[in-house]
From Swiss-Prot:
Name of the molecule in the record: Zinc finger protein 518A
Main localization, broad class: nucleus
Biased composition annotated in UniProt, kind: Polar residues: 1170-1179
Species per Swiss-Prot/TrEMBL record: Homo sapiens
Physiological role: Through its association with the EHMT1-EHMT2/G9A and PRC2/EED-EZH2 histone methyltransferase complexes may function in gene silencing, regulating repressive post-translational methylation of histone tails at promoters of target genes.
Span of zinc fingers (C2H2-type): 150-172, 207-229, 234-256, 262-285, 1449-1471
Source species, domain of life: Eukaryota
Family to which this protein belongs: Belongs to the krueppel C2H2-type zinc-finger protein family.
Sequence position, cross-link Glycyl lysine isopeptide (Lys-Gly) (interchain with G-Cter in SUMO2): 24, 357, 392, 425, 433, 524, 596, 713, 798, 889, 902, 928, 994, 1015, 1048, 1060, 1083, 1121, 1185, 1446
Chain spans, region Disordered: 350-415, 1164-1188
Gene that specifies this protein: ZNF518A
Upper classification of the organism: Eukaryota, Metazoa, Chordata, Craniata, Vertebrata
Amino acid sequence: MPSEQKQLFCDEKQTTLKKDYDVKNEIVDRSAPKPKISGSIHYALKNVKIDLPKINIPNEVLLKHEVDKYRKLFQSKQQTARKSISIKTVSCVEECTLLHKSERAEEEGVKMSAKILNFSCLKCRDNTRYSPNDLQKHFQMWHHGELPSYPCEMCNFSANDFQVFKQHRRTHRSTLVKCDICNNESVYTLLNLTKHFTSTHCVNGNFQCEKCKFSTQDVGTFVQHIHRHNEIHYKCGKCHHVCFTKGELQKHLHIHSGTFPFTCQYCSYGATRREHLVRHVITLHKEHLYAKEKLEKDKYEKRMAKTSAGLKLILKRYKIGASRKTFWKRKKINSGSDRSIEKNTQVLKKMNKTQTKSEDQSHVVQEHLSEEKDERLHCENNDKAPESESEKPTPLSTGQGNRAEEGPNASSGFMKTAVLGPTLKNVMMKNNKLAVSPNYNATFMGFKMMDGKQHIVLKLVPIKQNVCSPGSQSGAAKDGTANLQPQTLDTNGFLTGVTTELNDTVYMKAATPFSCSSSILSGKASSEKEMTLISQRNNMLQTMDYEKSVSSLSATSELVTASVNLTTKFETRDNVDFWGNHLTQSHPEVLGTTIKSPDKVNCVAKPNAYNSGDMHNYCINYGNCELPVESSNQGSLPFHNYSKVNNSNKRRRFSGTAVYENPQRESSSSKTVVQQPISESFLSLVRQESSKPDSLLASISLLNDKDGTLKAKSEIEEQYVLEKGQNIDGQNLYSNENQNLECATEKSKWEDFSNVDSPMMPRITSVFSLQSQQASEFLPPEVNQLLQDVLKIKPDVKQDSSNTPNKGLPLHCDQSFQKHEREGKIVESSKDFKVQGIFPVPPGSVGINVPTNDLNLKFGKEKQVSSIPQDVRDSEKMPRISGFGTLLKTQSDAIITQQLVKDKLRATTQNLGSFYMQSPLLNSEQKKTIIVQTSKGFLIPLNITNKPGLPVIPGNALPLVNSQGIPASLFVNKKPGMVLTLNNGKLEGVSAVKTEGAPARGTVTKEPCKTPILKVEPNNNCLTPGLCSSIGSCLSMKSSSENTLPLKGPYILKPTSSVKAVLIPNMLSEQQSTKLNISDSVKQQNEIFPKPPLYTFLPDGKQAVFLKCVMPNKTELLKPKLVQNSTYQNIQPKKPEGTPQRILLKIFNPVLNVTAANNLSVSNSASSLQKDNVPSNQIIGGEQKEPESRDALPFLLDDLMPANEIVITSTATCPESSEEPICVSDCSESRVLRCKTNCRIERNFNRKKTSKKIFSKTKTHGSKDSETAFVSRNRNCKRKCRDSYQEPPRRKATLHRKCKEKAKPEDVRETFGFSRPRLSKDSIRTLRLFPFSSKQLVKCPRRNQPVVVLNHPDADAPEVVSVMKTIAKFNGHVLKVSLSKRTINALLKPVCYNPPKTTYDDFSKRHKTFKPVSSVKERFVLKLTLKKTSKNNYQIVKTTSENILKAKFNCWFCGRVFDNQDTWAGHGQRHLMEATRDWNMLE
């Protein structure tokens, strides 16, 4: 019995009953045979060998925490062993221990597939089972030196070597066993038994127990289970439940006890086992689990957000409307928004106390904050973030705060105040635009992906504030305008870095509405807004009083404090958007410069009365050509580069917007005048101004007159801005935001224009305010030193730049005029309009300050724009003539010094795209500057903007204001060009042309104060706004009407390398036989302003500007001997006083080809001079038949017409006395005045000797007086120059004859070179745009639009014509044209324009080329789709018509356009990959 009891006890613990049909591996270990079994049976069993496959555990739901538990068990390789029937006996203690452990393991739910051979360690005596290999390793590790034992399950055999054990097991294979299920006499070997079970007792792969519901797929497990039913069972006394182990029975008894160790928290369910409870919850309470999981996740995210939100700048990307641009917006933070608003309000109130403007602005901001409080975007936590952005809208520094207020306030209507970061009081985000206070530099560190979103990482570094103290702006205060805090964009680095890096947003700090410029990416400006702004601005202008300071204009609150707010509301918003757009177009990197479209300048002009910031906004706004007003002007813009068509449009637009409200202004075509010259430069100025709103607005206000003269000024500013944009440094010069529109605006423009890498503009570093700390900081040390030295050399001469930046340029009337010259802006003369400060010199364009005293025009009324400083007003009131001698001397000296400085600076600046010119031309006494009053005179502005040509715009004559007033003609070029001021029909100020690298300028200024500056952009080979001031930023002659002599000879602006500026008397004027040295020329200038012709060679030597002015005789001449001039006399009889004058301006582009252009010598200019020098009799007698006033002053820039060389001769009738507008119309807009970009100033002048020789030749033609000291930069040009000079005489005769004929305008064109015979390569050639297909865009090809030989210099060659026709025939299918040798040779030869019709026989004979006898057969590679119709026949299949719109796919992230869907999809995938690279990492 005892043994039996032992056995039962052991079995009790060994066997495991699976309740609830849980499958468990039960271990049946029989230590001894049951008493029932007979000895024979027992013996038979002894020999039984059971070989069973692995046991698979049925699939059950396991809890995660349980899986972890199991994993630990698995790691220890604990396995449930299945024991077959064994006869070996084990001691009771050992069996009980083992069984107990195995039971405990089973209770824990250990389910592992049982292996056939598993062994336990007899040393450890635990329940862990090992495979043979594992057991061996176990012994080596834990029982070193001992051998494992492998006991046989069938008998008592035990082996220390597994191989021996395996051999032993083979002895049991022959053992026969019975099937317990069948319970018949059949006996099977173990292998056959397994087969029997599988074939007989397996249903669908499962073995089902008949005594219970247990089922398994493993034969071995099933066999073990069957044997358990044959053993003693533990039955429940309360029910019929049978347990195979004592432990299971105890668990079962819990059911009857009424207590459940596991209860459901959602209902009253109870379970005895945890698995049951888990099943219950999963089945019935899933929703609770999901809710709980979400809650925990939210808590986790909040906890994480609290820890990281303050450390990073989180911006949310979203799209607005249909715009493809990417905007960034900050997440909202509910808490702290009220506090931030209150703080902002307090700051704004304080600012109001400081400045009148701030009052309204703060109010607006406050309202705006309250209104958009919900919309405000905050970082996720209100805690101060070390990194960046203050929740306060801007509390920049006090001065800066004001500016910041202005900018946002102006655009408050449509701008949202987004608070960037609690800590950054210096960073403000409004309407997706970031503004950083001037005393901080914002560095764009890059993008980071966090939580699947892209974040911008910015680094703010405090820097020394460059802004001048408000006190320094006292000059502006003089005007009575509220001084805007000079809130220069210290964000220069920020702007340049961020704007270039992020096309999305522009960071503007200007206090004016521009402070927040629209994202650079936005390339579009809504014309409607601009128009609205313009109209409002016009109203503002009307409200402005003449002499009232801007502050006085405060009555029109818009001008002063209101001006910031109102202008902001009207203009600023539009301006900001447009401005940003504008910037975007020109160059994202160059914020200030980027504004391409001068059109927007139009608005600026009107807001002249407004704060400079407002004007800037307008300028900026007109980034697009959309405005209809501008579109009217756009016709003349064909000269624009393919990509820059917008600029011309913008410029025109600007003029259009600047529509004067007074009909008088309209009559003077003020719109046109202002718009074009300023457009590009003005836009750039506006842009800069936007960064420095006060300065720009200030200059505009100066322009403003009661009638809205501001328009002209804004144009000028526009040009100015363009030049600034050219600045390479990318640093905005900080100029005071003085609202004194005159000085502050111009100066700020210069400064603001800090760095513009705009591809369109030459890089120009503003030397504008040399004395100002801000300006000097941005200049290289060597440049600053040179500039300082120059200033010291001539203390009497003041540069505009010398003025403190706060004052903007304190331009006296003269100075302001100089600025206008620099900017190349045209001021439209009107009774009420003063030209003062109208022509600010773009700081970037030329370092030289040109005295504008003479240039300043006082129109009609003595009332000055309130913005004009008192000093300027006084200077205007001063008699002009009294200061002439002094001015002339000063000017001559200044010119010399300028040239010296140029030579010095040349080396330093050659690397830069721009050249710095310093002209201490301003009178030592700026207050005494002379302002030229023109009653009927016209101002002819030739502005080159954005590399377009030099267009001349006709303007209305201005009535004489003073009896003494010198009539100045204003020609307003609808196209950018030079500004020429004609007084009494005289060309007075000629600005030297400036080349990007080298200052090759021989400036001949009739008047001492005018030193025009011409800039050539090296990269673009075009004259830039600097040029606007360019070819003599302004040509103006100042003299009393009595004393003025008409210029009879052509003016040629020729930059000379020589330090001395040479004035060359007109070839026609015989009176001046004296050699004009600088001193002589100055004297002569003083005495005879009109006579000396000006020769300017573009620094490249590619273009000479020939200005020929035929003027009616005036009864009173400054000096009678001048009148005696034969030429002059000739002129007199033909032109009685009051008769309209005709002015011929010729620009010769010597080279057709770029290569040729490089080699151009002065010869072209010389020849042009000679041609123009045709005896005054011819020109005058012919009365300049050039009836085509349309062509008047046509200057073409090659930039727009890449290979163009165009010489346009235009006669503009300038009625001296009559107020009629000059009839100068462009012959065709397509032929709009264009200056070949190649034709800059002809730098390639030969040495002085060659120039002397040339001039000696030219002398014979008409000017005995002229001896020119030309310094030619290229010695190689001598021969060319000689040849060119020899040729002109022949032309002369023809010209003379033509003039007599007074033929059709065509004849005139021919006369002046529109139809030319084959000439040397240097000869000028006319390009005609002739579309072979009506679908072909000829005027303004867009960006990447393929244009076939559009403006090619050889476009008219018959060979090219045939090729073009063939290309047009195949409608874009021609991929390649292989030209024959004959065609190539023909193209290499000079083009022959109608050789039989050539007027110059000599030339035709010398250069005559014969047309090819037979048409050239060219080989074309066609892209055609062929369809096979028969064996050897193919049919051309028409491809998709060009008219059919092709599918376009826009990138969702960057907006890039694709026409291939696959490419588009792949591109988007790369964005996704990049976005998810560092998904949750922000370092």
